[in-house]
Structures are given as structure tokens and as C-alpha cells.
């Protein structure tokens, strides 16, 4: 608790000077800016079987800096302090000429969409469960992105081991790629359809086992209701398909993800999948934007109110492989008000339904009301 309070004090001090503390060289070829965020979460849970306690917490704290130099170069160093633990987030250097971007460091692979969105930009308190289950954490590697009017292509090579994993033995590797096509693009209005894929080979420390897990659409619940432990793994394929539409005050995002594990001949291969769809409408002064290089929608801006809805199905059951990790359906509605470019407040309601193979109590239905106040700069 003492560590958390100290971090919050530092963050407040950080925020109070961040507007002025942008360092620039006299020639204008170097600029350094402080960045950070803090998320205050709270939730009330209603369950018929699992004892889910109401909770409040400081979910995420970030501190870092972004450095721009020599016109086209950028560096970023960001550390996380969630739950009083220090972790490495984005730590990379990149070169961009407007159409091409080369990035080296600790960052997300060019695969999937939802799980790569920053916590302060997520539409609900938690990412879509499908994204959590089959997305990937940041890894150490190199990636390249090319962007033009109708096309965005990314590819990368990464280590398959988390940077904080100290286990000995040869590391695995991952190859990933993402392709976006924009059939419609006029000013800030964009429609894109995309596909992505990832191939991974695990290192010696994993002992030929891959585990997929996810909980409810909330960061306040530690329980993993979905969990599939895939043994005798040889390698892993992941596939994704996505649609993003940004049309003035309307926003739509949908994604399908599938994980396929090739296993040794004595057992059947494993397949798990899921999809979600979410829609938003910006009230008051807001309208959505779109980042062409990342292929992500941006928030509607200060003094705006977002009304949101999401439906998600995640299935980790595979009878042929003999692995029943559970299936979850969840429905969420919510809203976000942006007081200014630094402070926002979120509120949402979620209804979750689990099948008989789910962990932590089997078949059940429960609901939750969650809120968040966030500061980011």
C-alpha cells in the first residue's frame, strides 16, 4: 500500500509539470515529453454461485517518456506499477517517414486488435474476453509497417518469451503479420477490413505446454473462468479477422480470433476461438477519429459522451482434443464522459453466462456494475 501511495504522489507531481516539461533543443531536432496514466476502478458484483467480492483498486499506473529526434526518429520508455508491481511496458525505438515505420524493442506484435489498445483508450473497464484469451502480451522483437491510402501491411519477428521470464533454456520465437484493406476512406471517415496471423514455437522452459485463460470482462475479478491447458504442443498458429468502421459520430469494431495448436501424433490438435462486436455513438461535441498507421479508432475528444454496447463469445472447448476449457458469453453496455483531454470517467454494466465446463463453479450467470476515473497525459 505504501508503494502504491508513493507512486500516486509521484504521478500527481508528474502530471502537474507535464504540460510545461517538454524539453526541446534550440535547433528543434530533439524533444522529450513526460507521459503517464492512473486508473481508479470500482465494481459491484452480483453472482448466483461464485462469491465475487465488491472491490475498488488502483488498477493501472504508468510513468514514462517519449523522445523525438532528428525529425523521423522516436523512442519510448514506459513502466507499469499495477498492483504495486513494476513491469516493463512499451520500450522501443522507431523510425518513420510517414508511410513506413520500423520499430525495434519491447512492444506488441502486429497481430489482433483489441488487446493492443491501451488501457486508457479501452471502451470498457476490461478488454474483450476473446482478446485477452487469444491475444498476446508485449514481446521483444522487430516489426515493420507500410501504410498507404487503401492498404496497411505489418510484419514482425519476436521472441516467444516474456521479457520478465528468467527461466533458462533456448527461447522460442514468433512470426506475426497483419494486413488491412480500406474500401472506404474520406477525410476522417474510414472502413477497414483486416486479417492477421501468428506462428509461434515455444522455448525449452515451457515444456511443450500452452495455456489459454481469461476471466470476466473486468480487471477487478482475479478468477479465470476459462482455462485450457494444451499439453504435447509442437507449435501454435493464431488467426484473426477484423472490421473497424469510423463514420462521424458512429464507431464499430468487431474481431474473430482462433488459436490452433499442433500436438504430437498421439493426441488430437487443439482449437479454440471467439469473437466480439462493439458499437459506439458520440454525443455532445464528439466525433471519432482514426489512426491510419496503427489501424485503430481514436476517442471522440474533450466534452464528449460515448454510449457503448458490446457482445462477446469465447469458446475454449474442444471435444476432439479432450480439452474442455469452458465457454463464456457476455453482454456489456456503458458510457464514457471526457471532461478534457486528461480526465475521463467510465461506467458500465455486464452480464456474463458460463457453461458447465467453466472453471470456478461451472455453469452460472452473474452480472456487474463497474466504474472508472482515469487521468492520462
What name fits each language-model region?
Residues 49-50, 95, 208-377:
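Outer-membrane beta-barrel pore domains
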Residues 13-14, 116, 160, 259, ...:
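Single-residue recognition of alpha-helix boundary sites
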Residues 1-22:
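Bacterial Sec-dependent N-terminal signal peptides
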Residues 21-163, 167-203, 281-287, 291-299, ...:
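Outer membrane beta-barrel
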Residues 17, 86, 163, 261-263, ...:
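A short hydrophobic/aromatic micro-motif that marks alpha-helical segments and, especially, helix-coil
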Amino acid at each position: 500500500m505504501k508503494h502504491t501511495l508513493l507512486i500516486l504522489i509521484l504521478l500527481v507531481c508528474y502530471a502537474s509539470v507535464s504540460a510545461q516539461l517538454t524539453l526541446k533543443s534550440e535547433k528543434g531536432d530533439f524533444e522529450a515529453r513526460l507521459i503517464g496514466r492512473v486508473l481508479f476502478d470500482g465494481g459491484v458484483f452480483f453472482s448466483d454461485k461464485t462469491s465475487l467480492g465488491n472491490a475498488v483498486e488502483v488498477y493501472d499506473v504508468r510513468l514514462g517518456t517519449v523522445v523525438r529526434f532528428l525529425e523521423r526518429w522516436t523512442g519510448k520508455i514506459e513502466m507499469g506499477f499495477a498492483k504495486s508491481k513494476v513491469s516493463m511496458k512499451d520500450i522501443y525505438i522507431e523510425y518513420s517517414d510517414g508511410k513506413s515505420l520500423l520499430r525495434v524493442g519491447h512492444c506488441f506484435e502486429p497481430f489482433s486488435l483489441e488487446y493492443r489498445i491501451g488501457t486508457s483508450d479501452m471502451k470498457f473497464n476490461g478488454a474483450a474476453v476473446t482478446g485477452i484469451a487469444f491475444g498476446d502480451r508485449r514481446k521483444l522483437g522487430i516489426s515493420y509497417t507500410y501504410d498507404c491510402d487503401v492498404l496497411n501491411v505489418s510484419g514482425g519477428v519476436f521472441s516467444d518469451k516474456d521479457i520478465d521470464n528468467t527461466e533458462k533454456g533456448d527461447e522460442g520465437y514468433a512470426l506475426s503479420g497483419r494486413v488491412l484493406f480500406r474500401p472506404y476512406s474520406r477525410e476522417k471517415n474510414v472502413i477497414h477490413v483486416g486479417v492477421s496471423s501468428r506462428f509461434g514455437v515455444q522455448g525449452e522452459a515451457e515444456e511443450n505446454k500452452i495455456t489459454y485463460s481469461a476471466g470476466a470482462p473486468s480487471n477487478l475479478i482475479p478468477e479465470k473462468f476459462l482455462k485450457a491447458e494444451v499439453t504435447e504442443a509442437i507449435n501454435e498458429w493464431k488467426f484473426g479477422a477484423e472490421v473497424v468502421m469510423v463514420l462521424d459520430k458512429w464507431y464499430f469494431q468487431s474481431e474473430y480470433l482462433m488459436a490452433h495448436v499442433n500436438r504430437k501424433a498421439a493426441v488430437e490438435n487443439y482449437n479454440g476461438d471467439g469473437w466480439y462486436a462493439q458499437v459506439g455513438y458520440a454525443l455532445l461535441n464528439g466525433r471519432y477519429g482514426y489512426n491510419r498507421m496503427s489501424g485503430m479508432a481514436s476517442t471522440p475528444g474533450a466534452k464528449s459522451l460515448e454510449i457503448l454496447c458490446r457482445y462477446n463469445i469465447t469458446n475454449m472447448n474442444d471435444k476432439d482434443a479432450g480439452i474442455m476449457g469452458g465457454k463464456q458469453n457476455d453482454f456489456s453496455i456503458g458510457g464514457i464522459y471526457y471532461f478534457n483531454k486528461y480526465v475521463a470517467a467510465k461506467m458500465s454494466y455486464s452480464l456474463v453466462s458460463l457453461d458447465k465446463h467453466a472453471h470456478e463453479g461451472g455453469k452460472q450467470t452473474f452480472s456487474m456494475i463497474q466504474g472508472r476515473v482515469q487521468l492520462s497525459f
